[in-house]
Structures are given as C-alpha cells and as structure tokens.
Amino acid sequence: MRVTTSVAIDGMLSVHAAHAVYTALAGVDGIITADVKVGRATIEHDGRATHEQIIGAIELAGYRVTEIRDERRLPLL
C-alpha cells in the first residue's frame, strides 16, 4: 500500500534547511519519495514508515513537526 503523508515543519526556512530534512528522510526505511519545500514535506512511502520515524528523522535534522497526516492510500504497483 502506498501512503502519502503531509508534514508541516516549523523552523525550516531555507533551501539549505529543506535539503537537510530531505537527507534525513532518505534514511527512513520505506520512504519512496520526499518532496521537501520550505516549511513542509510531502512523503510517499510503502506504509512501513511510521509517523514516529518520520518525526524522528525531521527532529534529528533540527526541526519540529507541527502537523502530520496521511492523505491517501493507494495500492503499490
């Protein structure tokens, strides 16, 4: 099952910061893609990546998650 997770991120105010978050998310098992922009990220994963793992990766990069939610679930092809 493919899951799209939307995340609002506090303090991520530059392209450099977005790259740091992108790099941190790349280390989370199950993440297929991550579109990280200033203040937010849209993550597609196979369902193995938990909210706790996603939040942990973002916090490890030095930022705080203010909102996280799953937007849609699609079968993996």
Protein language model annotation of sequence segments:
Residues M1-L77:
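Flexible metal-binding regulatory segments at protein termini and peripheral loops
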